[in-house]
Amino acid sequence: MNNSINHKFHHISRAEYQELLAVSRGDAVADYIIDNVSILDLINGGEISGPIVIKGRYIAGVGAEYADAPALQRIDARGATAVPGFIDAHLHIESSMMTPVTFETATLPRGLTTVICDPHEIVNVMGEAGFAWFARCAEQARQNQYLQVSSCVPALEGCDVNGASFTLEQMLAWRDHPQVTGLAEMMDYPGVISGQNALLDKLDAFRHLTLDGHCPGLGGKELNAYIAAGIENCHESYQLEEGRRKLQLGMSLMIREGSAARNLNALAPLINEFNSPQCMLCTDDRNPWEIAHEGHIDALIRRLIEQHNVPLHVAYRVASWSTARHFGLNHLGLLAPGKQADIVLLSDARKVTVQQVLVKGEPIDAQTLQAKESARLAQSAPPYGNTISRQPVSASDFALQFTPGKRYRVIDVIHNELITHSRSSVYSENGFDRDDVCFIAVLERYGQRLAPACGLLGGFGLNEGALAATVSHDSHNIVVIGRSAEEMALAVNQVIQDGGGLCVVRNGQVQSHLPLPIAGLMSTDTAQSLAEQIDALKAAARECGPLPDEPFIQMAFLSLPVIPALKLTSQGLFDGEKFAFTTLEVTE
């Protein structure tokens, strides 16, 4: 846990401080008082009765002693339970395909008042310009949008072609920005463990802030070494004992439930009264359809309570206070005097039914957020422009030659997990000995004119058609999977024509496509419109076979080399356990 940074009263002047104290003493009038409310006590359990008194952005007082205190406005909570605003400990807003402005509109009314964001998706495409845009969005947001400075751009040096670099010098220029809380996930964990100086330089430069980790399945001496380097947390754990061991060794555990990686059921049994200060909730990657239909962090809290019997105060603790403490955001995470007035009023605390949200001391109106979204997006000066530097392709670009009797490597998908298995299949004149094998290709889109890297994919469930996307972690080249080279080419050419996006092809025709004009990653449509388009894409994709729940998000991780076991980048097949390229044909 890193408490070396403290943003408490970071933006408060001495005059504002004096006004806050005057209201706390009862010598001045509050801006708001929330009456008829019970406050969930995250520290001791149980509830605290009495009003919540607000002056400016901060809570001036809590409890029955303020029952008769004067206020400019009073809010009748109608018996609601008040909890601190929810915090997502680790996410990439770009993976929602929404801009930061649209993301705020979609999630703030659900109680998500704070996010800790790593914008490495757009930084991989556009470099520092992408980070600068996220910083501009964070500066103007009502939501507390904090940034971790992207540490691995690209994810792994020499393994893929991406659109830009993000040097240590550029990273340092953002280190002292008021919205920056630390260094984002250090994905090259073998490099850290082996003591590569370039990586240690980054860790040293941000050591006074929070150092995010990324080490799926790591254990033994390697895990000890990774933690010894100063890494403080991990969001990639997917096994119970893996999570327990990381907690034992002093790591904080981010329990992730995204649209593709779903680890909450595996890790929730770890949460208890003792270790909950070291446990946090995060989504990493969650799409707009799920946000609209199921929720965001509110959905995770609901499942902890309903499915895993986590006590109320512990469930809400890991959704707020634990994360605030971990990142040194000591002005957040509790409903207490001097804390920022980020408050969620719940008509039903067990079902996480949000009645009203206040952030920075002001009530949130969802309709007003929506009405101002377009103007706020324009004010942020989004980095528009076509980032696809790739000529149209033909079916011959995906031609692979196979020899009967030979064995070939297959990327074997595990539905709703980011890890894959490395399997193999024997080819004969009748095809492969597995009927679930289809083709996968990755095409770099940054003007290097490389031939497509091609491979085999199993377990995805694609029986016909093709899917293509420019959302392809972390370099965001074009990834396509399909049963025929002709349909793969059609899908790729559609996303090239769109300037980036997602596409479903079946029966030789484009069935559905979604343009993503910002970096080939994000739409400028409203959250509702985007959710409807995602729904149409998923419906079209389901016609291609029994695919994963979120086929495009699952497909996006098939090219990420820092998650085992077998992946495909623009450079070829990559063994994520040996951290080395391998061949399509099995020769050993």
UniProtKB/Swiss-Prot annotation:
Organism annotation: Escherichia coli O7:K1 (strain IAI39 / ExPEC)
- Catalyzed reactions per annotation: adenine + H2O + H(+) = hypoxanthine + NH4(+)
A GO molecular function term, named singly, is: adenine deaminase activity
Q: Which CDD domains match?
A: AdeC
This one is known as Adenine deaminase
Keywords, in A-Z order:
Hydrolase, Manganese
Q: Which HAMAP family does UniProt cross-reference here?
A: Adenine_deamin
Has keyword Hydrolase?
yes
| EC number from the UniProt entry | 3.5.4.2
The subunit field of the Swiss-Prot or TrEMBL record says:
Homodimer.
* Superkingdom: Bacteria
Q: Which cofactor does it need?
A: Mn(2+)
InterPro entries documented for this protein: Adenine_deam (IPR006679), Adenine_deam_C (IPR026912), Amidohydro-rel (IPR006680), Metal-dep_hydrolase_composite (IPR011059), Metal_Hydrolase (IPR032466)
Single Gene Ontology BP annotation: adenine catabolic process
Hydrolase found in the keyword field? yes
Q: Which family does it belong to?
A: Belongs to the metallo-dependent hydrolases superfamily. Adenine deaminase family.
